[in-house]
Regions:
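Sec/Tat signal peptide C-region and signal peptidase I cleavage site
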Residues: 19-23
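Sec-dependent N-terminal signal peptides
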Residues: 9-17
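Copper-binding active sites and cupredoxin-like electron-transfer domains
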Residues: 24-366
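Bacterial N-terminal signal peptides that target proteins for export
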Residues: 1-10
């Protein structure tokens, strides 16, 4: 018996023994969700309009080579649904999350998924391990509200786990309270737009001359990539899969007066999101909606291996930088995004009193 077979057999026995009869015959309506690539998020209700449902999602693992900067640096990436990060899935507390995980025959490695929001050993990883050419269906109950990451955890041990995550295999789930988001006093909070920013550290090996190396296959890249990863010094720290993925023409959009919810995840390293010229009106820094949000933050902290959420109402037009406020990572390694906000300037909030001019000598005292 192989290790993989033993793990799956033990997990299956545990599942059968622990599963009550009601879970085998859920009398709930089903909703099939068409996922979209980040930073966008699929349509969803902020306040649940009916009782719990079975929310159906489909995630397809894809191994592919991608370009991660304007220099043409290539990564042998591993992804969910072809994007880094994988899609954000939105449900409500009490819903059942039913995920079909597909590993196409065109892939070369086993993959699975660990849901941080789920309750059960390995977050479902032992029950979702699929070889190329296989698919599996996992269902778990959303019992805790908040934003939670998911990631690949093949086998649960050894170098495959950090390699798959550092190659792009993570995403997030948002479990909303059934009656929606609220402030510390219980007042309802609403957002007009939502964006999902997935921060990712990459470790691209270099040759003897310091140039980034390119590999034909994932297996070819494995040994050198692991050596680079063990030094814990990323060559790139990016938002949504590559340098400038969310800047310029790809900037996230908003209008003055609109409230935007920003979901931010990092599966590996700590991060310090900061909206340049804006604030976190309400921030769930640990990502858990059962905790009251902090208010009026200038910079917030996302622990490695977690996700957080921040709500902000834009009051001025312009281009807002959204950065990891480790400025080396923001400006040198790529952790920068933009919000492009349209509207009318409020001169009461900010105005240039005098335009730049030559320095004037100060009058001497009599």
């Amino acid at each position: 018996m192989t290790t993989r077979t033993a793990i799956r057999a033990a997990a299956t026995v545990a599942l059968v023994l622990a599963t009550p009869a009601v879970a085998q015959d859920l009398k709930l309506s089903r909703q099939k969700v068409e996922l979209v690539a980040p930073p966008f998020v699929h349509a969803h209700e902020q306040v649940a309009e009916q009782g719990p449902k079975i929310m159906e999602f489909r995630l397809t693992t894809e191994e592919k080579r991608i370009v991660i900067d304007d220099l043409g640096t290539k990564l042998q990436a591993m992804t969910f649904n072809g994007s880094i990060p994988g899609p954000l899935m939105v449900v409500h507390e009490g819903d059942y999350v039913e995920v079909t995980l597909v590993n196409p025959a065109t892939n070369s490695m086993p993959h699975n998924i660990d849901f941080h929001g789920a309750t059960g050993a390995s977050g479902g990883g032992d029950l979702t391990l699929v070889n190329p050419g296989e698919q599996v269906v996992l269902r778990w109950k959303a019992t805790r509200t908040g934003v939670f990451i998911y990631h690949c955890i093949p086998g649960g041990v050894g170098p495959m786990v950090p390699w798959h995550i550092a190659s792009g295999m993570s995403g997030a789930v948002m479990v909303l309270p059934r009656d929606g988001l609220k402030d510390a006093a219980g007042k309802p909070l609403h957002y007009d737009r939502i964006y999902y920013v997935g921060e990712q550290d990459f470790y691209i090996p270099r040759d003897a001359k310091g140039k980034f190396k390119t590999y034909e296959t994932h297996i070819d890249a494995f040994a050198d990539t692991m050596d680079a990863m063990r030094k814990l010094i990323p060559t790139h720290v990016v938002f949504n899969g590559r340098v400038d993925a969310l800047t310029g023409k790809n900037a996230m959009l908003a209008k003055v007066g609109e409230t935007v919810l920003i979901v931010h995840s990092q599966a590996d390293r700590d991060s310090r999101p900061h909206l340049v010229g804006g604030h976190g009106d309400y921030v769930w820094e640990t990502g858990k909606f059962s905790n009251p949000p902090e208010i009026n933050l200038e910079t917030w902290f996302i622990r490695g291996g977690s996700a957080g959420a921040a709500l902000y109402t834009f009051l001025q037009p312009g281009i807002y930088g959204y950065v990891n406020h480790n400025m080396v990572e923001a400006f040198e390694l790529g952790a920068t995004a933009h919000f492009r906000v349209e509207g009318t300037w409020n001169y009461d909030l900010m105005t240039q009193v005098k335009a730049p001019e030559p320095v004037q000598a100060r009058a001497s005292l009599p």
